[in-house]
Amino acid sequence: MFEVFVKKVNSDIVIRWLLTKITIPIADISAVTTDDTYSGKEKQAIRIGMPYGTTDRVVIITKKNTYILFTTNYIAIQKKLNSYIHSL
């Protein structure tokens, strides 16, 4: 229930968490990485998910914003995002 969900819709990535829905054009994504700090290195990032001690962080860097996804399933989300980016 508190997990972050990521899916591809046409040429966009849709991120859902609780009542939040964020749409990012795939063409705007420049990198997908991980972050091992507690709150994320990027101070101005948009944070999505529950930031508690055992979560990992997936970072999406776009032309305009940086998004930090707090998740316990970071490998699957990172693989999914990379496959969406390389499918264009």
Summary of predicted features, one role per range:
Residues 1-25:
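Conserved beta-hairpin
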Residues 36-54:
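An anionic, turn-rich surface loop/hairpin at beta-sheet edges
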Residues 19, 28, 73:
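A short beta-strand motif that forms part of the nucleic acid-binding face
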Residues 13-16, 32, 69:
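Short hydrophobic/aromatic-rich beta-strand segments that constitute the beta-sheet cores
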Residues 23-38:
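Phosphoinositide-dependent membrane-docking surfaces
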Residues 79-88:
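Glycine-rich, low-complexity intrinsically disordered segments
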Residues 20, 30, 64-67:
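A structural signal for the main folded, soluble domain(s) of proteins
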Residues 51-76:
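Canonical phosphoinositide-binding patch of PH/PH-like domains
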